Amino acid sequence: MRRYPTLVVLLLLVLLPVLGCDLSMKRPIMDEIRKTGVLVVVTRNAPTTYYQGRDRVEGFEHDLATLFAAHLGVKVAFIKKQSRGEVLQTLHEGKAHLAAAGLVRQEEDGDRYLYGPDYQSVFQQVVCRRGGVRPTNLLKLTQAKLTVVKESAYEDRLRELQQLVPQLTWHSDDNLSVEQVLEQVWLGKVDCTLADSNVVALNRRYYPELTVKFPINAEQRLAWTLPKRAVFLHKEVVTWFNEIRSNGQLDELFEKYYGFVEGQSFDFVDNRQFIKRMSERLPSYKHLFMEAARKYHIPWQLLAAQAYQESHWDPKARSSTGVRGIMMLTQVTAKALGIDDRLDPKSSIHGGAWYLSNMRRRLPSTITEPDRTWIALAAYNVGLGHISDARRLAKKQNLNPNRWSDLRQVLPLLSQSKYFKDTKFGYARGDEPVRYVAKVRHYNDILTRMERKNYTGETTPFVEPNTALPMVPLKEQAVIGEINPMDGRMVETSGKEAAVPSPKRRY
């Protein structure tokens, strides 16, 4: 009988390696989260993930993780890293419960990690500077000075392609993020880099000289990454993603962060002109925008963006319809506000700010931010009556009349007789407010981004980068070279600059 305890000890010693993974789950991750009341998330500090906004932290992944923590009934804490390698290392060391960092699902890592549901699709793209080197395929890329983030998915892909093209070389940098490498390309310090299409779609609006040459892989999927042992947390993630897809919360986040990008073609000339005028014209009126912003509780960047859409910051602007000034006020509006001179910048800016504030105030209380602001901008452009018609039409079509993403679908219908004949205010060029809001949001995003970069002391593209580089006319764009992702062969197709796909939702 005395031998049994000894046998039990020996048996445990033999089985310990086998049971190791189960013993490591003695305190599952979900229990740890509930005990501490904190969900620890590792992310990347970037425009597509997590960044310091005007008065709070923002970012698609930040908001998504914050919503998930609220679903669990706990607080959220973020660990900021720069590269994919650092993010995964943090996860591997057990310092975070999950990674919400815009990471691509890597099936070959399935033995190390669990992945949440896919929520976005991207492509890796070769990005260079307009007027610089013009690689049209993988062979020609070997002649460029190529830099990528060290131990990133981009470097993994280059290693694969190097098996096809041995002369392909690159420099891997462990001090810069992908966004910072894109800036180096824009500054002319690096010829080309690789970046995901969603990252390119946002960043080329800040750096318009960035140009996409060709994609180098098939569609990839973004998903949250969790430690292999986080089985119960993974189940919560899957269940919750299904919920936010059904209740529209995921759509709302995409609208917030990509609504001004989705479906919008990139206008290089307009973007470049806007950034140029940020240094040439904006300084003369910035203090007026800030003054009106404080008075009417509207971000000055939004007012400035709207003014640019109205007049390109020209205080003497006028149109054939009779609107005039930097905010293009009508005579009726100016008279109602007691404005004698619509060409006076201060009067015009304050008048426009009051009018936008009034539109926002008059909207139903069921419309919340940020939709309230986007719909108010549409009302500024087309009139509150037509917005009311569009909201009623949205209800008839089982759409949400309080959500801008739904209203922008029905507004263009107001130009069709079968729809406007039954409305109170009749015909409207409904596509105009849709374009108007998209452009204002686009300019607002650039202004906000540039202000943030000024605040943090980063380089800001207010001045022309590397003016020695010649500008290439749009009509002289190179032939696109693509790699067939199935067999690695190069495919050449004639055409314009490679398009940057809009960020694609994965559902």
UniProtKB/Swiss-Prot annotation:
Read off the Pfam families from this record. Answer: SBP_bac_3, SLT
Topology with respect to the bilayer = Peripheral membrane protein
Q: Give the enzyme class.
A: lyase
Which residue windows are coiled coil? Answer: none
From the Swiss-Prot or TrEMBL record, state where the protein is found.
Cell outer membrane
- What keywords is this UniProt entry annotated with? Cell outer membrane, Cell wall biogenesis/degradation, Lyase, Membrane, Signal
User: Which residue ranges are recorded for the region named LT domain?
Assistant: 264-507
Q: Supply the InterPro entries for this chain.
A: Lysozyme-like_dom_sf (IPR023346), MltF (IPR023703), Solute-binding_3/MltF_N (IPR001638), Transglycosylase_SLT_dom_1 (IPR008258)
Q: Which SMART domains has this protein been placed in?
A: PBPb (SM00062)
Q: At the top level of its lineage, which domain of life is listed?
A: Bacteria
Q: Report the GO molecular function annotations.
A: peptidoglycan lytic transglycosylase activity
Provide GO CC annotations from the record: cell outer membrane
UniProt-annotated catalytic positions = E310
Please list which residues make up the signal peptide: 1-20
Using the UniProt annotation, give all residue ranges assigned to the region (Non-LT domain): 21-261
Q: Please quote what the entry notes about the protein's domains.
A: The N-terminal domain does not have lytic activity and probably modulates enzymatic activity. The C-terminal domain is the catalytic active domain.
NCBIfam families on file: PRK10859.1
PANTHER family (UniProt xref): MEMBRANE-BOUND LYTIC MUREIN TRANSGLYCOSYLASE F
Q: Which HAMAP family match?
A: MltF (MF_02016)
- What's the protein here called? Membrane-bound lytic murein transglycosylase F
